[in-house]
Amino acid sequence: MLGGSAHGGPVFGGVQAPGARYILPSFEERTAYGYKRQDPYAKLFEDRIIFLGVQVDDASADDIMAQLLVLESQDPDRDIVMYINSPGGSFTAMTAIYDTMQYVRPQIQTVVLGQAASAAAVLTAAGAPGKRLALPNARILIHQPAVGEAGHGQASDILIQSNEINRMRAWLEETLVKHSSRTLEQVNKDIERDNILSATEALKYGLIDQVLTSRKTLPALVK
């Protein structure tokens, strides 16, 4: 659910905040300067790969934006790859990442592993044209935004929330039209309820450009 929480908590309907996870292993690599210990995410970052595998919130948005800006400073003409497996989350956190993706010079290739729901679906579609991919069993979910705790407070407060959610929905519709092959009328209808698309359906919808069945086709898309 595209929305927000005053405390940065989970806002995607039915999704619980992740509990304790397994310990991420670290490993050593031999370099010209000796051995270097690092974790898988650091290794991916060295290869200009960003992994969005959590809910989209202020913390994850800050992490993603920082990585985008650093990779741009390292090489502004080389692609960045963003792997996505996310249930979505905060609207404002999503727009912060979205704007940064459009702002940096490198083209952003997006690859969906598992799912890209709600806010994460928008980020998937915002990748560079021709470089938005999904694995065969990935799914993409689009729906209208919602504001947490809406409907409470004085009449003037409710009106403010109503105006804001209308603004959010208008932005979402225009953005999905921009990054898909659908019309505004089609998108308006399609996001009224949860709209779950398979990788093939997302391809037909225009949210991605290719269903990635083999890794052999991936390097050709990266400059």
Swiss-Prot record:
Q: Which domain of life is it from?
A: Bacteria
Q: What is its EC number?
A: 3.4.21.92
Q: Which Gene3D superfamilies match?
A: 2-enoyl-CoA Hydratase, Chain A, domain 1
Q: Could you cite one Gene Ontology molecular function of this protein?
A: ATP-dependent peptidase activity
Location, primary (coarse class): cytoplasm
GO CC annotations, alphabetized: cytoplasm; endopeptidase Clp complex
Alphabetized, the UniProt keywords read: Cytoplasm, Hydrolase, Protease, Serine protease
Protein location: Cytoplasm
Q: Name one Pfam family in it.
A: CLP_protease
What are the BP-aspect GO terms?
protein quality control for misfolded or incompletely synthesized proteins
Catalytic activity field: Hydrolysis of proteins to small peptides in the presence of ATP and magnesium. alpha-casein is the usual test substrate. In the absence of ATP, only oligopeptides shorter than five residues are hydrolyzed (such as succinyl-Leu-Tyr-|-NHMec, and Leu-Tyr-Leu-|-Tyr-Trp, in which cleavage of the -Tyr-|-Leu- and -Tyr-|-Trp bonds also occurs)
Q: Does the keyword Ribonucleoprotein apply?
A: no
| Job of this protein | Cleaves peptides in various proteins in a process that requires ATP hydrolysis. Has a chymotrypsin-like activity. Plays a major role in the degradation of misfolded proteins.
What family classification does the UniProt entry report for this protein?
Belongs to the peptidase S14 family.
Q: How does it assemble?
A: Fourteen ClpP subunits assemble into 2 heptameric rings which stack back to back to give a disk-like structure with a central cavity, resembling the structure of eukaryotic proteasomes.
Q: What is this protein called?
A: ATP-dependent Clp protease proteolytic subunit 2
Q: Which gene produces this protein? A: clpP2
